[in-house]
Amino acid sequence: LTHQPLPPNPEVWQVILSDHRLDSGDPWLRVKTSHRPVYERARVALPAGVDEAILLNEGGEVCEGTITSLFLRRGGRLLTPPLSCGLLPGVLRRSLLEAGRAEEARLMPDDLRDGEILMGNALRGLIPARLL
């Protein structure tokens, strides 16, 4: 077991759409586990200068990042994909939904160009992101 300080977040994360797909029917996607082969493959494939990859499911719907939940601020609303798309019910995601600060909505890749992308987790909070 090792530890080290968490480096500060870049002001804006650079993100890409991953070629790796999630299976929305996979029950393991909804459990925090160290068995994360799809996420690990997508993370290893990140080009230099890219902070995160956005994963889609088999239907092309937006799901989440490799280590983050995804949010889209559009029209005064903070949207996040529903669990039925195949994603982890993260702590930050759940707290924003329960507080009424976010709502679930099915998102497609084209939707990401019509709002402000935010990636986040309980450790780092919400981080503005730019889709490359």
Give the location of each predicted region.
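Helix-start/capping segments and mature chain N-termini
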Residues: 1-132
